Swiss-Prot record:
Subunit composition and interactions: Component of the Sec protein translocase complex. Heterotrimer consisting of SecY, SecE and SecG subunits. The heterotrimers can form oligomers, although 1 heterotrimer is thought to be able to translocate proteins. Interacts with SecDF, and other proteins may be involved. The channel interacts with SecA via subunit SecY.
Membrane topology, Periplasmic segments: 1-14, 64-67
Gene: secG
Highest taxon in the source lineage: Bacteria
Protein's UniProt keywords contain Protein transport: yes
Topology within the bilayer: Multi-pass membrane protein
Protein name: Protein-export membrane protein SecG
S-S pairs: none
Keywords linked to the UniProt accession: Cell membrane, Membrane, Protein transport, Translocation, Transmembrane, Transmembrane helix, Transport
Chief place of localization: membrane
Amino acid sequence: MKTFFLIVHTIISVALIYMVQVQMSKFSELGGASEVEDFTPFLEEEKASTPVERSLLSCLYSFSFPA
């Protein structure tokens, strides 16, 4: 049963990350902030290596330091 919930949780997490990336790309197409470039110093400091890590750190950064 734990394995089932782990698989479901993973699928939901990946889907949410994908939805955030799609919304961020739509926002940048409309002339908003760029996707990752605004967080480049933070991401380099944290050594994010995959797109998923970069988007998670970007979300974390945006919630940690609101405008």
